[in-house]
Amino acid sequence: MRLAIYPGTFDPLTLGHLDIVEQAAGIFDQVLVAVARSAAKVPLLDVDHRVAAATAAVAHLDNVTCAPFDGLLVDLVRERGACAVVRGVRGHGDFEIEQQMALTNRRLAGSLTTCLLIPAPEHLGIASKLVREIVAHGGDVSFLVPPAVLPFLPRQ
């Protein structure tokens, strides 16, 4: 079985994230959406709600599961026996960041494949930060997140 891990804070999971998950689900036998408990960010949703929202959004994908994680990604990869890490890339800026992370993870893990996937053009401009900003001002984000995620978002 080929397991890939798609890590992120997913605060909240967007249509762009879902696009990447769906692509990965078509490539790998199993995909784990690993929801990070990020101490560096102040989240819109706590980790349990982010996992629940992600789980609801990927319910149509039989080979995808969601779970929280702490610590180094390479430790989770070893623990789960994953063959690859999946990341989404929207543009040049994302590529440079992801390249640096992939090389660092490879050094930490000895060898680790990172699969960079590009979302559909209509999802390129979507970012969780944008969603959080709109939610904070009481705006409509239904065109940015999967319908299953909407009930988890705070109402302003």
At which residue positions do the language-model features occur?
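Nucleotidyltransferase catalytic core that binds NTPs
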Residues: M1-Q156
